[in-house]
């Protein structure tokens, strides 16, 4: 499973592809046209795993510890 969404709690924690965890003050942006997801400066916001609105997966507990 590839997690591409940020936490919704404002913790600015985000998992990009390849288990790349964005730290505080960064957010994950979804790559397009085959580009990889990357961490950029900005407040973390939920990012969908698919193109369906409201289709989010929880961040695994082990990443939040």
Curated annotation (Swiss-Prot):
Family annotation (Pfam families): Hirudin
Chaperone as a keyword? no
Where is the region Disordered? 32-65
**Provenance organism:** Hirudo medicinalis
Q: Which family does it belong to?
A: Belongs to the protease inhibitor I14 (hirudin) family.
Where is it mostly found?
secreted
Q: Which residues carry this modification: Sulfotyrosine?
A: 63
Q: List the disulfide bonds.
A: 6-14, 16-28, 22-39
Gene Ontology cellular-component annotations: extracellular region
Q: What protein name does the entry list?
A: Hirudin-3A'
Its biological purpose: Hirudin is a potent thrombin-specific protease inhibitor. It forms a stable non-covalent complex with alpha-thrombin, thereby abolishing its ability to cleave fibrinogen.
Provide the residue span(s) of the region labelled Interaction with fibrinogen-binding exosite of thrombin: 55-65
MF terms from GO for this chain are:
serine-type endopeptidase inhibitor activity
Identify the keywords attached in UniProt to this record, alphabetized: Disulfide bond, Glycoprotein, Protease inhibitor, Secreted, Serine protease inhibitor, Sulfation
Question: InterPro entries under this entry?
Answer: Hirudin (IPR024793), Hirudin/antistatin (IPR011061), Prot_inh_hirudin (IPR000429)
Q: Where is the signal peptide?
A: none
Compartments, as annotated in UniProt: Secreted
Biased composition, class Acidic residues, residue ranges:
55-65
Question: Where are the annotated segments for Interaction with thrombin active site?
Answer: 1-3
Keyword Secreted listed: yes
Positions glycosylated per UniProt? 45
Origin: domain of life: Eukaryota
